[in-house]
Design a protein with these regions (language model features):
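P-loop NTP-binding module
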Residues: 1-174
Length: 174
């Protein structure tokens, strides 16, 4: 939907890392992973969340420290045949729980909520969620339903990012 969710996830991760926090950015959008592309990284294939969950790699091998950005990244992998099933796997929850012990912040980039169940599934592993909304894409009832889906999973909604707005008459900076 090009709402900018990956850009928000990457920039939040970068801001936290630049402020000295230990950050893990997880690309859980297994249908269209784009975190690495957004960071300008092309050499981490075979080091994704699916490799950890299916036991092909342990997390310390799959999670890569990106010196340039001072943060850790766990790549996505679009070759997974059933991303929803993989993200629902108990091992995914175990991995996130273990990662919470090692990192100050874990930022999880997911597919857009409402299109597939993946975002709502990942929300149950989080302490809070940020909902990225692109102007004029979804009607208000669909947005409210998506917020309900997120919070029913047990996550707190930290806030919303109203993104890619074209209306400059409402104020702002610049």
């Amino acid at each position: 939907a090009s709402e900018g969710k990956t850009t928000v996830a990457v920039n939040l991760s970068l801001a936290l890392a630049q402020n000295g926090y230990s950050v893990l950015l997880v690309d859980a959008d297994l249908r269209k992973p784009s975190v690495l592309k957004n960071l300008g990284i092309s050499n981490l294939s075979g080091n994704g969340i699916a490799d950890v969950v299916n036991g092909a790699k342990n997390s310390s091998d799959a999670i890569k420290y990106i010196e340039k950005y001072k943060m850790f990244v766990l790549a996505g992998d679009e070759s997974i045949t059933d991303p929803t099933e993989m993200l629902s796997n108990a091992k995914t929850g175990e991995f996130i729980a273990a990662a919470k012990e090692k990192f100050d912040y874990i930022i999880i980039d997911t597919p857009p909520i409402g299109i597939v169940a993946d975002a709502a599934i990942c929300a149950k592993y989080t302490d809070s969620s940020i909902f990225v909304i692109r102007e004029d894409v979804f009607p208000v009832p669909a947005i409210l339903e998506a917020v309900s889906d997120l919070t029913q999973g047990g996550t707190d909604l930290a806030g919303c990012v109203y993104n890619i707005s074209t209306d400059r008459s409402k104020g702002g900076y610049g």
